[in-house]
Amino acid sequence: CKRRDIMKLIEVHSPNLNLLLPAPFDLIELPVRMEVGYEEIANDVRKAASVLVGEIMTKKVRTTKKDASISDAAALMDKHNVNRLPVVDENNKLVL
C-alpha cells in the first residue's frame, strides 16, 4: 500500500465539506510521534469509511457567536472537552 493510495481513500471532492467535516486524519487519530505502517493506516481509513455519521456525531453541539473572543471560545471548548466550535448567528444558523 502506497502513500498515494491512502490519500485517494481520504480524498474529499468538495471544498465546502472541509468547512463542516473534521480532517480524515482527525477521525483515525493518526499517531504523530510513532511510525505506523501505511497498510495499517489504510486499514484504519477503510474502517472509518464504513462508520455512519450518526454513530460518532456529537449529540449536544456547543456553539459560539462570531463576536465572541478567542479566549472565551477556547474556554468553552476546554470546559466541554470539544475540539470544534461551530459559529452561529442570532437565529442559531451556521455562519459560513
Swiss-Prot record:
Q: Which Pfam families does the protein's record reference? A: CBS
**Residue span, CBS domain:** 57-96
Which cysteine-cysteine pairs are annotated as disulfide bonds in the entry? Answer: none
| Top-rank taxon, per record | Archaea
Q: Which UniProt keywords apply?
A: CBS domain
Q: Which Gene3D superfamilies match?
A: CBS-domain (3.10.580.10)
Claim: Membrane is one of the keywords in the record: no
Its name, as the record gives it, is Uncharacterized protein in nifH2 5'region
Query: What is the phylogenetic placement of the source species in the record?
Result: Archaea, Methanobacteriati, Methanobacteriota, Methanomada group, Methanobacteria
